[in-house]
Amino acid sequence: MNLSNISAVKVLTLVVSAAIAGQVCAAESIVNYESANAISKQPEGSVRFIVKYKDGTPSSQGLKTRSTTKVMASGMQVAGFEAQFVRTTGLGAGIFAVPELKTTKEAHLVMDTIASNPDVEFVEVDRLAYPKAAPNDPSYRQQWHYFGNYGVKANKVWDRGFTGQGVVVSVVDTGILDHVDLNGNMLPGYDFISSAPNARDGDQRDNNPADEGDWFDNWDCGGYPDPRREKKFSTWHGSHVAGTIAAVTNNGVGVAGVAYGAKVIPVRVLGKCGGYDSDITDGMYWSAGGHIDGVPDNQNPAQVVNMSLGGGGGCSQNSQRMIDKTTNLGALIVIAAGNENQDASRTWPSSCNNVLSVGATTPKGKRAPFSNYGARVHLAAPGTNILSTIDVGQAGPVRSSYGMKAGTSMAAPHVSGVAALVISAANSIGKTLTPSELSDILVRTTSRFNGRLDRGLGSGIVDANAAVNAVLGDQNRAQPRPPVNQPINSGNKVYRSDRRVAIRDLRSVTSGIRVNDQARVGSANITLTLDIRYGDRSQLAVELIAPSGRVYPIYHDGKRQPNIVGPATFSVKNERLQGTWTLKVTDKARGVTGSIDSWSLTF
C-alpha cells in the first residue's frame, strides 16, 4: 500500500469511527436520498458516491492531497461494504466507488453512515446521465430548422454578417469525430471519463476527446429485462450536436451550423452506459475556464456550455454547486429538457437553477410528443428531423456521414448556436452580456408556437433574428407579431397574496394572484416582491408563471443563507396580463422546510 492509499483509508475511517462512536450529526449533513432511486437500473458494479466535506475539517484537508485522476484500490469499509477512493472533483468533493452495492436501501444505509460524520456537508449517489436523443429517418431533407416558418431564423442573422465569430461554445457530450464538416471549427478539448470500461480508449482521463462509440450489447448497462436496454449502436451524439452549433459552412460539403463562425471545445463525458454526474460537472466547469486538479487548464474558456444529456430525479447538490461555479465564470449553460414526455422538474440537470432548459418542437411549431415540459422549460427549439454530422460506424468510427436525429438534445444546440450569434452581435458594439442577460434576451425574444400547446414549453421558439435585434437595440426589425393592446407602465397598481404556503422537502408548491383590471394582452414593467422564509435558499427554485403559461425564472444568488426577501423587476412583452399569475417554489433537497409568507406584483 502506497502513501495515497493510506491517506485515503484515513479519510474514510473518520466516517466509520464517527458512526461507531455514535456521533450522529446527520441533521447537519444533506443526504440526497432521491439520488439512489435508479441504482437498480445501473450496470452491476457501477455505484459511486459523491461526498463533500465541510471546508477546513480534517476530512476535507485529507482529500486535498489526493490524485484527481488515478483510481486507488483500497480495503475501506462503509456500512459493511468495501469502498474505493476514486478521485476528488472540481468542487473539492471525494468520489468513492462501492462496487458490491445493488439496491436503493443499501445506498441509503451507506449514505446515512457517511452522513453521521460531522465533517460531511453532503452525500449523494454519483448518478449516471445519458444522451437525450433518439435516431430518426436518416434521409436528407432541407435543414428546415434554420429557416422554416418554425425554425430559428438563423439565415436572417447570417445575412447581416453575424456568424458567431469570436465565440467559443463547449459541447459536453460523447466526444467528437474526425469529420470534414467539423474539424475546421474544433478547439482542443479533453476526455473527462474516469471509468476505463466506459471510456473504451484504454485509459481514463486524457487530452483526447475522440468519440470511441457508445454502443453496448444486451443489458450491458443494466435494466434487464427492459427491452429498451437491449443492445444499441453508437449514436455519435456529441458530433451531431457540435454540427448543429458550428458545422463548417460555405465549404461545398454537407451541412451548415447555426453559428458557423464560432469555435467548439469538445468535452467527452459520456461513453458506454452514459456518464457520471461528477465527470460531467468537472468537464462543464473546466470548459468554462475552471481549474480541475490533474487536468491542464483550458486556454479557450467557453462563453456557452451545451449539455444535451440528463438523468432521472431532481438537481443534485454537486450539480447545482458546480453549475453556480460555472455560471460565475461567465458561461451560459444550455440544457436539454429531456425526452420522457414528463415534467422537466423530474430530470436533471434541467431541474437545476442557473441553466437555460430547452424543449423540442416539430416542423409545424408544435411540441414534439417526446419533449419534457413544464415550468422548468424556459424556451423551445426545433428537435425533430434535425440533419447534422455523424459517422456510418455502428460501433467504432468508420466514415464521416450525415444523418437525422430527434430529441431535446437536438433542440438545445440550436439555442447554444443562437446564443453564440447574439454574443457576436454584442461584441460588434462593445457590449458584454452576463449569462443572465443573455438568457433573458433569448427567452423574451422568442417567436410564437403554432397555436396553443398541449403542454408548456416556455416562452416560445428561439428566434435568432429577434434576439440579435434586441441586443443591438433595433426592436423595429424584430419578427412581426399579431397586434396587441398598448403597453401598460403605470407602476402603481399592487396585487398581493398574504396566504401562507408551507414548503416541504422535495416538493413544488404554488400560490396564485388574480389580475382582472389590466389589459388582456400587453407589455409591462413588473415588480415581483417576495417574502419566502426558508433556512437555505440554495435549495430553492423560484418561478413566476404568467396567465399564458409562460415561465419567468426568478434568479437569486444561490447562497447557502436563509430566506428570499425583496423585489425583482423585469419586463414582459406581448404577454397576457389578465388572469392568474402563479408563484411556484420548488424544494430540491431534504432537511430544510419553510414557507411562502407573502408576495406581490406591481404593474
From Swiss-Prot:
Residue segments, region Disordered: 197-221
All copies of domain P/Homo B, residue ranges: 478-603
EC code(s) of this entry: 3.4.21.-
Annotated signal sequence range: 1-21
Pfam families in the record: P_proprotein (PF01483), Peptidase_S8 (PF00082)
InterPro entries given in the database record: Galactose-bd-like_sf (IPR008979), P_dom (IPR002884), Peptidase_S8/S53_dom (IPR000209), Peptidase_S8/S53_dom_sf (IPR036852), Peptidase_S8_Asp-AS (IPR023827), Peptidase_S8_His-AS (IPR022398), Peptidase_S8_Ser-AS (IPR023828), Peptidase_S8_subtilisin-like (IPR050131)
Domain Peptidase S8 as annotated: residue spans: 143-468
Intrachain S-S bonds: C221-C273, C315-C352
One function term, GO molecular function aspect: serine-type endopeptidase activity
Proregion positions: 22-132, 477-603
GO biological processes: proteolysis
Entry-linked SUPFAM superfamilies: Galactose-binding domain-like, Subtilisin-like
Keyword entries, A-Z: Disulfide bond, Hydrolase, Protease, Secreted, Serine protease, Signal, Zymogen
Positions of transmembrane segments: none
Residue numbers annotated as active site: D173, H237, S409
PANTHER family noted in UniProt: CEREVISIN-RELATED, PEPTIDASE S8
Family: Belongs to the peptidase S8 family.
UniProt name for this protein: Extracellular basic protease
